[in-house]
Design a protein with these regions (language model features):
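Composition-driven recognition of glycine/serine/threonine/acidic- and proline-rich low-complexity segments
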Residues: 3-204
Length: 204
């Protein structure tokens, strides 16, 4: 199920809150979580949660949907190539989606997947969440997280708000793929507890 197939209202919500064109990309500065100050515990619990983010969005909302923005062959960003365990692989696909809670985009996700792995394992992925495949296959090994801060304007959102994201590497045999996720303004990750006034010490 995709958000844009549900009804016209949801499409209007997308145009207001997410107005970027595929491929959006994430040419940002990634850091270890220990090198930044995460503003509050609620955000920390989303950023560093090692479980399935898809399942967390599903459990935190009454209506869940996945919007496939696009998937195509693309040269990864330099910061993506430096993370990938390149083993003779020269062709990758970029896949970008929105995870939607209650008819609103909560998470932007970008995955960089070796073409050979797409051909052998993921050729029929379509609208299915990639996380469903990854977390149901015990063969995958996940790396530690890196985090980033990115302006909401990169996603066509008319706001000066700073958004937080994370990425990790999933490895299976000789294949390595990047899964990066940015929490959009409507995501519950930003609903900090009352009385919390801890501010990030890091800037974009």
């Amino acid at each position: 199920m995709t958000c844009y197939h549900t009804n016209r209202f949801i499409i209007r919500v997308f145009r207001v809150s997410f107005n970027a064109t595929f491929p959006v990309g994430l040419p940002v500065n990634w850091q270890a979580p220990s090198d930044v100050t995460i503003p509050h515990l609620q955000l920390n619990s989303w950023l560093l949660d090692t479980g399935s983010l898809t399942e967390r969005v599903q459990s935190s909302s009454e209506h869940f949907a996945l919007e496939l923005l696009g998937q195509q062959t693309q040269t990864p960003h330099s910061n993506e190539l430096s993370l990938l365990l390149v083993n003779g692989e020269t062709s990758y696909q970029a896949r970008e989606i929105l995870l939607c809670g209650d008819h609103t985009p909560w998470v932007f996700a970008r995955s960089i997947i070796p073409q050979a792995f797409v051909d052998s394992e993921l050729s029929n992925l379509g609208q299915e969440p990639l996380g469903k495949r990854l977390f149901n296959d015990a063969r995958f090994i996940r790396s530690a997280f890196e985090v980033c801060q990115v302006s909401a304007s990169q996603f066509g959102i008319h706001s000066n708000e700073v958004l937080w994201g994370r990425r990790s590497l999933f490895t299976l045999d000789s294949y390595s793929m990047i899964v990066a996720e940015v929490f959009l303004p409507a995501c519950p990750a930003y609903r900090q507890p009352a009385g919390s006034n801890i501010q990030s010490e890091k800037q974009l």
